[in-house]
Amino acid sequence: MEAVSSEYYFPLYSALGYFALVFGIGEIARIITAKYVSPRGNSQLFLYELIGTIQMCTCVYENGIIFKNYGFPAIFICVALLLTAGNIFNRGAMTNCAPIFEQFVFGNLGSSKFLTILSAQLIGATFASKFAYLIWNITAPYSTAHLENASNLECILHYKQTAGIVIGFEIVGAFVVRIVVAQLLARPALIKLIPFAISAYLSLALYVVGVPGLNPIVATARLYGCRGIDNSSFFILYWFCPVLGWLTGAYVVGQKSPSKKSAKDVKAEKKAKAAAKKSD
């Protein structure tokens, strides 16, 4: 009984070691970046985003082990904790293109920084699979779960619903998540629940649809090139749909462009400038 019990937790130990290694390497890379790369310009911003994206997308590859061996409750907790850890360690890296599209569209992010962040995310998504398989191959002699993953190069997407429902789920899901995030951000005591809210949606999508999206960068890293969906459908489903839902949610919660300030805001700014001049 004791032997069976210990074997049951072997995949968990493998996953925890994997996550610790990925975050450890990521943190070392961030420390080196902070020490040797100037915060002036976009170089440090690019590297932080690149490191964070590789780190988070590489961790997504290991989530399959958690779900396969421990089911929905475990994957919910796992994703929530990974997102929480990302918020702590990632130095502000977004690792998701939907928020930067939002900031750019509403005029809160310049084109230079927008392209810097987006290019870092795309490059990071490209390299995530290589890092995941590298770790699996190195640790395969010590982990049956990693040995199985390292030897399995086939990726097939299985959807539980029709195309229309899957598309609707992506749009509505991103819309709802954006609104929920806004509500939690408005209450400082509840901000820490944001990763759990996102994880709850992803777990629900996994149960209902079979292949969750929400984050186009993560979807690209993990799902692009898999059998079961062509390239055009992939970009519609995992890029256009979630970004559309996210931007719609941002519009509903009142994301404002700097060029569309209210008369009250403009008046307050003028008073502040006048007061500043008097103090000079």
From Swiss-Prot:
Residues 256-280 are annotated as: Disordered. InterPro entries: AQP11/12_channel, Aquaporin-like, Aquaporin_11/12, Invert_Aqp-10. It is a multi-pass membrane protein. It comes from the Eukaryota. The chain crosses the membrane at residues 9-29, 65-85, 115-135, 165-185, 194-214, 234-254. Residues 30-64, 136-164, 215-233 are extracellular. One of its GO terms (biological process) is innate immune response. Keywords: Membrane, Transmembrane, Transmembrane helix. GO terms for cellular component: cytoplasm; membrane. GO terms for molecular function: channel activity. Residues 1-8, 86-114, 186-193, 255-280 are cytoplasmic. The keyword Amino-acid biosynthesis does not apply. Residues 262-280 have a biased composition (Basic and acidic residues). It is found in: Membrane. Signal peptide: none annotated. Belongs to the MIP/aquaporin (TC 1.A.8) family. This is Putative aquaporin-10. The gene is aqp-10.
